[in-house]
Regions:
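Active-site/catalytic core of tyrosine-dependent DNA strand-transfer enzymes
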Residues: 47-86
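Exposed loop/turn and edge beta-strand positions of beta-sandwich/beta-sheet ligand-binding modules
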Residues: 27, 40, 59, 84, ...
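Conserved tyrosine-mediated DNA breakage-rejoining catalytic core shared by Y-recombinases
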Residues: 9-14, 18-53
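P-loop NTP-binding/switch modules centered on Walker-like glycine-rich loops
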Residues: 1
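Conserved beta-strand positions that form and line the central face of beta-propeller blades
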Residues: 32, 64, 89-92, 122-125
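Residue-level detection of the helix-turn-helix DNA-binding "recognition helix"
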Residues: 21, 77, 81, 103, ...
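C-terminal catalytic core of tyrosine-transesterase DNA break-rejoin enzymes
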Residues: 4, 8-11, 15, 92-118, ...
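Catalytic-site neighborhood detector that most strongly recognizes the C-terminal catalytic loop/helix
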Residues: 35-39, 49-51, 70, 108, ...
Length: 142
């Protein structure tokens, strides 16, 4: 679930692990992130899938994902080993999310708001668009 949530939100691992239930409003679909990597607070819209993932959780602790960074790292390594995947970092899920946001048609300012990137050049480093995913959008324009 934490992997799906990471891809749906584009949040950093540290932001996901610090996320508390009182930071989330499932009615408005907004997650509030405080003291992020760049020092700013950020309020991000959640996708329907992210809201559904969170709605299926039982709130037993103040943290949405009550695990340590080390526990997540070890679980990530186990998942990669079981799947025989080499070289994939948890942070790559953030790259995937940013690429998906652009493929959904979100603008640069919208994706920057969600991801927290202040520098557009850095944001574009996270973007790995797939031509096959843009065919339908391209067809609608011409």
């Amino acid at each position: 679930t934490i992997i799906q949530f990471a891809v749906e939100t584009g949040m950093r691992r540290s932001e996901i692990l610090k996320l508390q239930w009182n930071d989330i409003n499932l009615n408005t679909g907004i997650a509030s992130l405080y003291d992020t990597k760049n020092g700013d607070d950020r309020h991000i819209p959640l996708t329907k899938k992210a809201i559904k993932l969170l709605s299926n959780f039982t709130q037993t602790t103040e943290f949405v994902f009550p695990i340590s960074a080390n526990c997540l790292r070890l679980a990530w390594e186990r998942c990669k080993n079981k799947s025989n995947i080499k070289g994939l970092r948890f942070h790559d899920l953030r790259h995937e999310a940013v690429s998906r946001f652009f493929e959904m048609g979100l603008s640069v300012p919208e994706v920057a708001l969600i991801s927290g990137h202040k520098d557009v050049r850095q944001l574009f480093r996270y973007t790995h668009l797939k031509p096959e995913n843009l065919i339908a959008k391209y067809s609608n324009i011409f």
